[in-house]
Amino acid sequence: MSHPNKKFNNVQEWLGIPYGTASRFQKAQIVPFEPNHEYSQSGPASLQLTDPAFLNSDKGESEDCLNLNIWAPDNVQEKLPVVVYIHGGGWTYGANSQDTSDLSGLVASGKVIGVSINYRLGALGWLELSQYGGKFKDASNLGLQDIVLALKWINQYIGSFGGDPNQITLTGHSAGSFSLLTLLAVPEADGLYNKLAAFSGYAARYIPAWWAEELADKVLKTLELTSPEQLLTVDPKSLIKAVNQVLPTDVLKRGNLDTISIGIVDDEFLPNGVLKANPADVIKSGKHKDIDLIITSTTEEASWYAANIPDNVDPKTIEAVIDEMVYDCHIPRKQAEAIALHCGAGKDTPLNVRTRFFTDYNFTLPAIREAHDHAQAGGRVYQLSVGPAEGSPAYHGTDMYGIVGQSAPDASQEQLDRDNFISQTLLNFATDHHEKLWSPVKKNQLIIKDIGQRPYKGVEHAKTVLELFKGIPRP
């Protein structure tokens, strides 16, 4: 049963609908929709090491977290396009109950149905265990498998809520966007979506299989377990904490070339791998050129770390920044020195130079390359560069309220206008009003829409980044 939304009086909502169920480290199974149940409270979030208040979950956290929220306009007269939001949080935190996962703002336009999903996080969703076989044979990218299952559920049941299963736009932020672009290399997801709008996430930064297996081994040793079977009964919070103990404490180091982190595993060559190709290669091949894309980045993505946890990520010297580029990112030293100079070496602090480098290396570069590759293959792709607004620096996450059609608390008028542009962009994209969007990227021409205050022109900066990073991989 639906209930009126508390923010918008023309929106109905169904909260905490179970879409799947799974035992620990097992492949989830679909749960049929029960239309007569009460859906007045958001379902539990995945277990995580986050302040529960941040999640706004009515039912706290649980391993049994596979639920979704649906919002629909009152009195839907015809089948509407559907926008599905996949939350971010580095595959370790977040929920569909956060304010920045609440699609009621987009739905209040009367133009779309909104869905926001939960999936398993941290060790429970992304620890690679398939190498142990037996009960763990399917334990590869379980969180991604959860997302695919949610899309199957939506395809089967969204018509009951006024949604058109043949008009599905997936969107998300950060880890959510990395995940949705990865679906291009997951054949099981084919036909379950029509458009992808990726905000600050790309077909990149995959966990190499060697590290995924090493991480599992280190977790077992940290927990002093003698058999993988013991993972099935160990305290789940202890398991999640063990992963944190193993990963680099300097979070920026997790984004270097080898991606020593937890997240989507490049499991293409594993026996029960979910990915059947490298997603960036799929984009380049044109196999999914029929899927329209939006790809975005902000002008100061990694500066969030300098502003919020400077002691954790401060390299202290420019030499340390350059050495990191050379040894951890495999950039030739002369090229690394040129990149450091471009990022402010000699004029700014080593910390700011480092965060500018990671903004370009982990965000700007893959955004440009993937937009170019999709256009070259004959696909339609819109590229957006988000700058700061008054009271809202263009850090990673600055656009999250705009994506879902909500207003950030205490937002300036400039931020509200910028975020409203993002909301309207997503609505026009999902409803096929391409005439209301800017020009897509062309085969041999960079086209980037700039919004917010501009520290640079997007196209000019993109040309500089492509030249500086020429020949440098960012898988």
Residue ranges and their predicted role:
Residues 1-141, 165, 299, 409-424, ...:
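Non-catalytic accessory segments of hydrolases
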Residues 17, 358, 362-475:
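Mobile gating loops/cap/lid regions near enzyme active sites that modulate substrate access
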Residues 81, 154, 161-173:
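Alpha/beta-hydrolase fold nucleophile elbow
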Residues 165, 172-175, 187, 200:
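Catalytic nucleophile serine of serine hydrolases
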